[in-house]
Amino acid sequence: MKLKMFLMSSTPPGSPPGQADTDTAAKTPTTSADSTSRQQRSPAKQPQQTETKGRRYGRRPSSRTRPQKEQRRSRSRHRTRSRSRSLSRVRAVGSTTVSRSRSSSLTKAVRPRSRSRSRGRATATSRRRAGRGSPRRRRSTSRSPSTNTFKRSQRGGGRRGRGRGSRGRRERSSSTSPTPTKRSRGESSRLRGVSPSEVGRSVQSVSAKHTGRLGRLLDEAIDPPVILVRGEANTLKCFRNRARVRYRGLFKYFSTTWSWVAGDSTERLGRSRMLILFTSAGQRKDFDETVKYPKGVDTSYGNLDSL
């Protein structure tokens, strides 16, 4: 009765009871097969659902799988290994090239010496052959050893050169040693006295013309004539520079500009001054007549006992 009631409840309301039994009997094996297939598929879908529940977002269709990642990792490792091997080979080749270049440079550095020696020997033999033939070449060969010896003395003769210099200094000192004795003799003769013919030789006389020793002494007894010029310092300096160029031979000396100072203080009194010295009164007169003094400059005559 319970089975009938269950079947009746499972059949639709509009269908007759006889049909319901046949339908149920026909459908029952299919439902059992469907249930078994669903049960087999459900455990495969459950882990996916659990994974999606654990992750926030589902896996994309373009995302890489584990075998693809492993393949790419193996490829990258293979590439890095090949690169490291190539670098090691390049380094080994570079070291060999450096060693080769060093050896070649050493051989190059050694070879020119042998060439220079062979060249020097060839030049020496050529010079000897040339010396046998012509006299001009003999002269050149005879000059060459002197130059070589001179160069050797310049290069490696430091101590010898110093010794020679010290000898030269000693010789100079020995040659200059007798001069002080001569000076001492001259000083002793001066202290003893001076002959009348030597009097006044070192002193410049006032006049070039004289009549004997007595006339010269009389001319020297006269005081040398002087012109005192007063004015501004710059005007006096300019006048002095012009007179040196234009009026040569009309004067003897020019002094620098100077001024008087008070005894109690260091203040300058009046305008600056300058002295012009002459050998004779006639020279002073000629200078005064020919020279044109600048404006604001005053002159006065005078004589000095000595300079």
UniProtKB/Swiss-Prot annotation:
Biased composition (Low complexity): 20-37, 89-107
UniProt keyword terms in alphabetical order: Host nucleus
SUPFAM superfamilies according to UniProt: Viral DNA-binding domain
Family annotation (InterPro entries): E2/EBNA1_C_sf (IPR035975), Nucleotide-bd_a/b_plait_sf (IPR012677), Papillomavirus_E2_C (IPR000427)
Main location: host cell
One GO term of the biological process aspect: regulation of DNA replication
Biased composition (Polar residues): 38-51
Keyword Metal-binding: no
Listed Basic residues bias regions: 74-88, 110-141, 152-170
The UniProt record lists the keyword Nuclease: no
Location of the protein in the cell: Host nucleus
GO cellular component: host cell nucleus
Pfam families: PPV_E2_C (PF00511)
Region feature (Disordered): 1-208
Top-level taxon of the source organism: Viruses
GO molecular function: DNA binding; DNA-binding transcription factor activity
Protein's job: Plays a role in limiting the replication of viral DNA in keratinocytes. Recruits the host NCoR/SMRT complex to viral replication foci to mediate repression of both viral replication and transcription.
Protein family: Belongs to the papillomaviridae E8^E2C protein family.
Protein known as: Protein E8^E2C
Organism: Human papillomavirus type 8
